[in-house]
A protein has these predicted regions:
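Basic, polyanion-binding surface patches
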Residues: 1-190
């Protein structure tokens, strides 16, 4: 029997995304975004409030990067979610992390995070209920340490963080339990 839990953000898991952009003076800012997802083969949508520093930076620079946070960098990833760039001027510098310019867009790549998408701004979405940023993914970079022998990102090596909205916890992904577009194929024959 199921129990009513009320209104909850009940999508699980959510990725822990590190969104980085330059401000008007080329200063790096990074934000932890749990509410984001792929919305087409080469597009990503991020649900970020319009007044956030990251929103303003992307509006000015027309580009951003989205990195996948991993277990090894959980504390800094969490800091990027609880510290506001509008209130803490040296937010990125406090971490001791390193940024390099993207080769493909005008945005920083945070070297410590192992997988990063380089994105051009496509549009801002404004509705009565949600604000979003849609970006075109122009390239993905990955540290060789998280790639398998076929050159693909290996989830078990990546140790990507997942956000649990039920208990506000971070978890790690990694165990493969089936093959997508194959596990249910037997039911197609019925």
């Amino acid at each position: 029997m199921k129990k009513d839990l009320g209104v909850l953000q009940a999508v699980y898991p959510m990725p822990v995304l590190m969104v980085a952009a330059y401000d008007e003076s080329e200063k790096v800012n990074v934000m932890n975004v749990a509410w984001g997802q792929i919305c087409d083969m080469d597009k990503i949508i991020l649900f970020i409030g319009e007044g956030k520093k990251t929103w303003l930076n992307i509006q000015a620079s027309k580009a951003f990067t989205v990195a996948l946070a991993d277990k090894a960098h959980m504390d800094v990833a969490d800091f990027f979610g609880i510290a506001s760039g509008n209130k803490i001027d040296d937010k990125f510098e406090r971490t001791g992390y390193h940024a390099v310019p993207s080769d493909h867009v005008h945005a920083p790549i945070i070297e410590e995070f192992p997988v990063v998408m380089e994105c051009e701004l496509l549009e801002f979405l404004h509705t009565d209920h949600v604000d979003g940023i849609v970006g075109k993914i122009v390239n993905v970079k990955a540290d060789e340490s998280v790639l398998n022998e076929k050159g693909k990102v290996e989830p078990a090596k990546l140790n990507a963080l997942m956000f649990d909205q039920f208990q506000n916890g971070y978890y790690v992904t990694g165990e493969k339990v089936g093959q997508a577009w194959h596990a249910g194929a037997g039911l197609m024959k019925k």
